Amino acid sequence: MIKDRAIQYFMSGYSCSECIVQACIDEGICDECLLPCATTFSGGMSSGCSCGSVTGSQMILGYLFGRANKFGNKISAREKAAEFVEEFKKRNKVTCCRILSAGFSGSERKNHCVKFVSDACEILEEMMKVKV
C-alpha cells in the first residue's frame, strides 16, 4: 500500500511529490529515475500552483498510462489525469498548493498537508486497479 509508505516518507522530510514517487518506487510501480524529477514538482511546482501530491501522482499516471502504456491497454493517460484531478477536487475543492497549504510552514505545514498526500495516494491506488 503506497499510502502508508508515502506518509512515512513525507513526515520524515520528503516533499509531497517525492514521497508519492518514492513509495511507488518501493512498490515496484515505477523506475527510480523518477525521484529526482519529482523534486521540483513540490511546493506547487516550486511556485505555489499545483499541489505536489497531485503532480507526483500525475507523474506516476503518466509513467503507467503514457505512450508506452505499462498495462498494454488503450486507457488514456490524459483521461486518467483528468479523473484524478476531479476526484482530488471532490475531496479538497482545489488543487492549488497556496490555497491547500493555508499559509502554514515547517512542521505545521507537514501536519496540515499530510491529508493531501493521503488523499492523493488513495485516489492513485484506486486508479491503478485496471483491467488488462
Regions found by a protein language model. Name each.
Residues 1-5, 35-43, 99-102:
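Glycine/charged-rich beta-loop-alpha catalytic/anionic-binding loops adjacent to active sites
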Residues 27-37, 63-80:
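Phosphate-handling active-site elements
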Residues 16, 51, 97:
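Short cysteine clusters
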Residues 1-27:
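Active-site-proximal helix-loop elements at catalytic-domain edges
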